[in-house]
Amino acid sequence: MPSSLFADLERNGSGGGGGGSSGGGETLDDQRALQLALDQLSLLGLDSDEGASLYDSEPRKKSVNMTECVPVPSSEHVAEIVGRQGCKIKALRAKTNTYIKTPVRGEEPVFVVTGRKEDVAMARREIISAAEHFSMIRASRNKNTALNGAVPGPPNLPGQTTIQVRVPYRVVGLVVGPKGATIKRIQQQTHTYIVTPSRDKEPVFEVTGMPENVDRAREEIEAHIALRTGGIIELTDENDFHANGTDVGFDLHHGSGGSGPGSLWSKPTPSITPTPGRKPFSSYRNDSSSSLGSASTDSYFGGGTSSSAAATQRLADYSPPSPALSFAHNGNNNNNGNGYTYTAGGEASVPSPDGCPELQPTFDPAPAPPPGAPLIWAQFERSPGGGPAAPVSSSCSSSASSSASSSSVVFPGGGASAPSNANLGLLVHRRLHPGTSCPRLSPPLHMAPGAGEHHLARRVRSDPGGGGLAYAAYANGLGAQLPGLQPSDTSGSSSSSSSSSSSSSSSSGLRRKGSRDCSVCFESEVIAALVPCGHNLFCMECANRICEKSEPECPVCHTAVTQAIRIFS
């Protein structure tokens, strides 16, 4: 080490001087050389003690580091000091030879600087200077914009308003766009000022401007989200089910004025509109009944009050549920091509044979049963007209006037002819091949023979157990409209269903006096009629054989036949 070298030189010089004076062993030249060296060292100020302290303190000074916290006013100042992708803070670290830890979002805006004392002091001065510079720039910018009126708002310009447009948190960046291009475009197009929400705040855009411009900006924001995400934002939380098409409240149905089973399946009138706050995704969402287990009334039954070809195409497999069927006459001519007219009250009327509104059926309306009235295994009550009551074994009860013939099969048009497009859900048994079953959840519409039927509209043949189900009596006056019905006991169809009588005995129990013979075989009793012509001149076997032909037609009028129905008289 230099300090030890200088100390040895000093000790040797003093010792040599003493020896020279005492013994005279050293020459004068050596003493002069040593003295000259000591003088040079003394001129430099590096004697033995000072040199030792200087060289010993230097490594200790290099190893000492310090850490200091430098606060700034806000997180905006932090962003300004750090710079884009940290370019400014990297340059400051290299300039001051320090390590500067930047604060993360959500923490206090404090920089932590580590390094030598003078380097830390330099970095601290740079950070504070940059923060003050940014504060001055922001203050002057706010002052100039406030004087120029560039920041619109209710306090500055009269007539302007501010609204809040709430969007999902995940689409905030979508609305802002790359480098704010989308939100700037919306501001320029609508002449509004839009404040973008911060990351740690609610996803609400504050739009300021004239009322019409504010509305335009809101629509632009929602349209942009819809364009990029494929949907429209629901403004209220209660419309989530409506937006997804998975539920429908009972308010639409009960709003039509109906109550009970009929109103649950009724189609809303045009006066019923969706909630104002709702922005529907689809045009077929006005009356979705998916939560009730049936198809949408709007989608499959006309889609409004005007019939259309597309709606007729969709009617092949859909029909209203049985509890809402009431074959009543009403003035609504909203015919959907399936023989029914659906009204707000949950009723259905059968159109005239030629589809003209002036030839509507003239039978009396059949009101819906009261709540709590049995729907299955019920019998008709005795009507005020004096007609006897009788059980009817079919999918629905007839409320139409009977024909003038001795048989009491009924067609809504009256007489011996039936409408060609009427859905005869009353006393109808579809022609099916033996052993086949195709249950449906709703009454059959006009279809090809054998396409399927309601699970209650079971085919009733003259075999044991063929006694069918008795549906509810939809009117008290039905007995008067079915002349010649044989009085029965009060047990109704439940007794007939539990009986194990043979086919001949069960069919003979339904016969009445003066019955006719089949016009084909002239052996069996006339118990069947053909659809749609309505000629009731055949037994069930002959009627089935007619329908099972390759080109079935009525032997009387040579009209194409779709099915055979059994007459209960």
UniProtKB/Swiss-Prot annotation:
Sites bearing Phosphoserine, chain numbering: S4, S288, S462
Record flagged with keyword Ion transport: no
Domain of life (superkingdom): Eukaryota
Record PTM text: Phosphorylation at Ser-462 creates a docking site for 14-3-3, which stabilizes the protein and modulates its ability to bind RNA.
Alphabetically ordered keywords of this record: Cytoplasm, Metal-binding, Nucleus, Phosphoprotein, Repeat, RNA-binding, Zinc, Zinc-finger
Pfam families: KH_1, zf-C3HC4_3
Compartmental location: Nucleus; Cytoplasm; Cytoplasm, P-body; Cytoplasmic granule
UniProt feature, compositional bias: Gly residues: 13-26
Alphabetical GO biological process terms: protein autophosphorylation; protein phosphorylation
RING-type Zn finger ranges: 518-558
Span of domain KH: 66-127, 160-221
Primary site of residence: nucleus
Annotated consequence of substituting G177D: Prevents RNA binding
Molecular function GO terms recorded: calcium ion binding; RNA binding; zinc ion binding
CDD domains linked to this entry: KH-I_MEX3_rpt1, KH-I_MEX3_rpt2, RING-HC_MEX3B
A GO term from the CC aspect: cytosol
Residue stretches of biased makeup (Low complexity): 491-509
Chain spans, region Disordered: 1-31, 252-296, 338-365, 482-514
Tissue distribution: Highest levels found in fetal brain and testis. Detected in the adult intestinal epithelium, specifically in goblet cell at protein level.
Role according to the record: RNA-binding protein. May be involved in post-transcriptional regulatory mechanisms.
UniProt remark on domains: Binds RNA through its KH domains.
Protein's name according to its UniProt entry: RNA-binding protein MEX3B
Organism of origin: Homo sapiens
